[in-house]
Amino acid sequence: MDITEIMNLIPHRYPFLLVDRVLEIDLNKSILGIKNVTVNEPQFTGHFPARPVMPGVLMVEAMAQLAAILVAKSLGSTKNKEVFLMTIENSKFRRIVQPGDTMHIHTVIDQQRANVWKFSSTVKIEGEITAESKFTAMIKDKA
């Protein structure tokens, strides 16, 4: 799935669109996508100018955006729905992510009850687990 289809599924836009491509999707189960980290991203002007490091919170946001894509594809559409992050749990960051890295993000649906979905996600760089997190999202009708 390319960036055009991604932009049709989730509302995020530059500079906050943090998924570049979806490589695999197994509806109602899991999704694998990538984020190419480049020095031109605005967070690197202040985090940190001498040694740019991808903020952990943005890695978690990329995981959550991938989850929103999985929800949209699994439901068939989210045009009349919104996906909101409710909780973030057990986030761990094991390695620095910097410009030039490609984040391979794997997100799995752990549980789904009514409009509350639970996920677990990992980020790998060159096959090495770099970050992981569990989070919960709520799917609501648009107002």
Swiss-Prot record:
GO biological process, any: fatty acid biosynthetic process
Keywords: Cytoplasm, Lipid A biosynthesis, Lipid biosynthesis, Lipid metabolism, Lyase
GO cellular component, one term: cytoplasm
Active-site feature positions: H47
E.C. number: 4.2.1.59
Gene Ontology molecular function: any one: (3R)-hydroxyacyl-[acyl-carrier-protein] dehydratase activity
Family: Belongs to the thioester dehydratase family. FabZ subfamily.
Function of the molecule: Involved in unsaturated fatty acids biosynthesis. Catalyzes the dehydration of short chain beta-hydroxyacyl-ACPs and long chain saturated and unsaturated beta-hydroxyacyl-ACPs.
Full protein name: 3-hydroxyacyl-[acyl-carrier-protein] dehydratase FabZ
Taxonomic lineage: Bacteria, Pseudomonadati, Pseudomonadota, Alphaproteobacteria, Rickettsiales
Gene responsible for this protein: fabZ
